[in-house]
Amino acid sequence: MASQSSVAVISSAAARGESFPDSKKPIGSVRFQQPLRLSFSYCKSGNMSSRICAMAKPNDAETLSSSVDMSLSPRVQSLKPSKTMVITDLAATLVQSGVPVIRLAAGEPDFDTPKVVAEAGINAIREGFTRYTLNAGITELREAICRKLKEENGLSYAPDQILVSNGAKQSLLQAVLAVCSPGDEVIIPAPYWVSYTEQARLADATPVVIPTKISNNFLLDPKDLESKLTEKSRLLILCSPSNPTGSVYPKSLLEEIARIIAKHPRLLVLSDEIYEHIIYAPATHTSFASLPDMYERTLTVNGFSKAFAMTGWRLGYLAGPKHIVAACSKLQGQVSSGASSIAQKAGVAALGLGKAGGETVAEMVKAYRERRDFLVKSLGDIKGVKISEPQGAFYLFIDFSAYYGSEAEGFGLINDSSSLALYFLDKFQVAMVPGDAFGDDSCIRISYATSLDVLQAAVEKIRKALEPLRATVSV
């Protein structure tokens, strides 16, 4: 069964303290290419439940003929699978097989797309607006994006400085590919969104990861940044509000970072602002391009998925210097062409809801804040758990490392974020993403883009899961 092979991939890695291995077995919608070479110590010891264990030997039907060279390129083989996708798909397959799972892994709003936005897409279909558009995006949408950037962010762009893409992820990748050369360094504060490091590798660049501290709200220390910059430094990726931590960079800190960047002529900034509207007062959002002398150095990426609950519409955009945007457009023309005509019409309607999404988005943010407050208080009361209160987005990045080294009866040793996440999933049916996927193995990410009732049930399960572990560690 899919659910069996899915969890087996994770369980074997956790048992050995390794990242998820390659596999020819399917994990939901994800399929890896190398045969499983696993030691199923958890399964053999009887610690794992029967639904979790799967055979390590690939099916004969999946074995390729040795007479045909079906090898993959080194570029693809160097990439790591997204653990967010692995956990999300795994939880879904378990649910489909009849196992109830509380799913807190996916970074997807639980709200419906606003009705007026959905109607705009439906009307586009009814009116026959279903053909190719300009590669860069329809003029109406790019003009609306320019107005948004001017009114909300204080940034002046012309439509030819905007590139609409099939989601912000595509915008980010194209920006990295457009400005990075082999051997360049991409500076990435950790914890980071899972795709940043892999996108750098796709450009034959070297990701340079700078750890941050929970005691500093996971914010980049300017001194640490300065110590890592070299002549090879080409791109700094910043995400505020942050996925996975929810941290928001105050303007004063961004100004410090900008002063350091100004000393390095080759260094550009890729500012991921996809969670811009999901922010909790008194925190405020500052676009990096609005800082002194940073306009020409900054590539701003944003989109519609998070704020407007439009994840399935696949619509994002890049704003930046004209020649870089043109280069990204050239890439897009060879990769996907323009974004969906229907989604673009919906995007125009979304930007017409008012500043920061108007009352519609404000109601969503109000609900997210209520959920955040509940989780911070409820989980913060658990002994040994450390939390930095998020100021934006809809994630908690929780430090559970005090429980590493514990022994769980009927499970085994818990020595890292992967084994702890597996323990939560296998024994208590709560799906969360291990922190090592984001470059910080001390934590686990919880998405609170779900109902308060579900979160209350999750907290009770997490409490029960941690209770028996306390006896085996000094918490």
Curated annotation (Swiss-Prot):
Q: Which PROSITE patterns match?
A: AA_TRANSFER_CLASS_1 (PS00105)
Query: One short Pfam family name for this protein?
Result: Aminotran_1_2
Q: Which cofactor does it need?
A: pyridoxal 5'-phosphate
Which Gene Ontology cellular component terms are annotated? Answer: chloroplast; chloroplast stroma
Compartment(s): Plastid, Chloroplast
The cross-references to InterPro entries, in alphabetical order and at most eight, read: Aminotransferase_I/II_large, AspAT/PAT-like, NHTrfase_class1_PyrdxlP-BS, PyrdxlP-dep_Trfase, PyrdxlP-dep_Trfase_major, PyrdxlP-dep_Trfase_small
Positions carrying N6-(pyridoxal phosphate)lysine: K306
**Protein name in UniProt:** Bifunctional aspartate aminotransferase and glutamate/aspartate-prephenate aminotransferase
